[in-house]
Amino acid sequence: MLTYALVGLEPRRVEVEAHLQKGVPSFAIVGLADRACQEAKERVRSGIVSAELEWPLRRITVNLAPAELRKEGSGFDLTIALAILAASHQIPAGSLREHAAVGELALDGRVRPVGGALVVAEGARRAGIEFVLCAAESAGEVALAGVDPVPVHHLAEAVAYMRGDWLPKPAPPSSANGGAHVTCPDLAEVKGQRRGRRALEIAAAGRHNLLLAGPPGTGKTMLARRLPGILPELAREEALEVTRIHSVVGLLPSGQPLVAEPPFRAPHHSSSMPAIVGGGSGPSPGEASLAHRGVLLLDEFPEFQRPVLEALRQPLEDGVVSVARANGRATFPARFQLVATMNLCPCGGRGDAAGCSCSAVRLARFREKLSRALLDRFDLVVAMPRPRASELDGSGEETSALVRERVQAARSRLEARPPRMSSEARALLTEAVERLPLSGRGRARVARVARTIAALAGSDEIAREHLAEALSYRIPPELTGK
């Protein structure tokens, strides 16, 4: 019977074979199975007995082919159990050829969901298999792959289905994981910070990386956490990409398998390299991949380990994370929008009326964490001063819903007919390259931001004022000391 192992986000075909022969009763699993997979012996034996089926008193050998592919996890349990039951003539062996299976068995025979059911179902579809037996909770994500799920709650139901004695109820139609804009904090709650709000809108419209810098209490984190609320829903293909990643790590909510909203991830600054970029013995996706097609917020940006920050340079450029291990390489998509917040100095007083108390040495060490190459990958850098009391008491700020409409309109314009740069804007850009410390990458990013600003303005042409605003968001001297 067929199932699939996961190598990154790719399904690798695994044929589960069971052989029974006379001899001292025993049960062995061969085929480079890890510990969790080897422990299936106890779960499968208990599950078959709990389903009031006969456990064969034979020498049982289960082979997971191909042998050179490492098999990890408990998702092979259901397939192993059905293969043994077919080998012992308790279910028709011929019916196994038309089905794939994925699921973990409890000791009482219940079928539990496992991560990656969507990826397994996609592998089955490519192999021409139309039916996938799975836990009832996984039926929604299996259906997303374009195959027919066979949702079962218990091994006994799977056996009855294979015998032709029982048909499962059709799985209820899965709903998208919507509602993120309802629960996301509203942009209207942010008082003042006109420049920060403007930069947030530009970042949302053009999918630009954004760095908010300023003293504590100026609303940097508050503003950054409202970015998901002004982002449009994902396109169908984008939603499937995100759902595939979240399926592998088991983060899909039951009943809402399709992630239709851009994901938002905010890891703690103490997070390790594997936690951020992915890794482990598996390996598995990290926060960078879990934020694919969404937002990765790094609050207190300089507090992250420098190797972790530097490791983000590759996915920021290429949109993928490659994790190499002795047994192979796994690649995960990681095309995320990076949003970071930071103080301007270790004590936080720089840029505030209280003033900075840091020594020159301490300030230099603080800035060393932020390499020029990393800062250059931010399209928008905004210094956020402390708002005035009159701004905090004000009202009438724009809501997230209103800003999201403008963001969607700008994105549609960028996709249909991107604005072209005028001769005046081109001359200003040439002058900026000559006078400012602007790298080739920085020049391209300024042009992209100017294009987004023009789209937000409803213009078919990048005017001089659009480019001037884009240049104003480049790296301020207070971040580098130059």
Language model feature labels by segment:
Residues 1-211, 215-221, 324, 460-482:
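Peripheral, non-AAA+ core regions of ATP-driven protein-machinery
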Residues 30-41, 56, 63-73, 283, ...:
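Basic, amphipathic alpha-helical bundle interface domains used for macromolecular binding and assembly
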Residues 199-201, 257-258, 263, 268-296, ...:
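Conserved alpha-helical scaffold flanking the Walker A/P-loop in AAA+ ATPase domains
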Residues 212-256, 318:
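Walker A/P-loop
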Residues 214, 278, 300:
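The Walker A (P-loop) glycine that initiates the GxxxxGKT/S ATP-binding motif of P-loop NTPases
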Residues 238-274, 279-280, 385, 423, ...:
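Conserved inter-motif catalytic segment of the P-loop NTP-binding fold
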Residues 293, 299-301, 311:
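Walker B catalytic acidic pair
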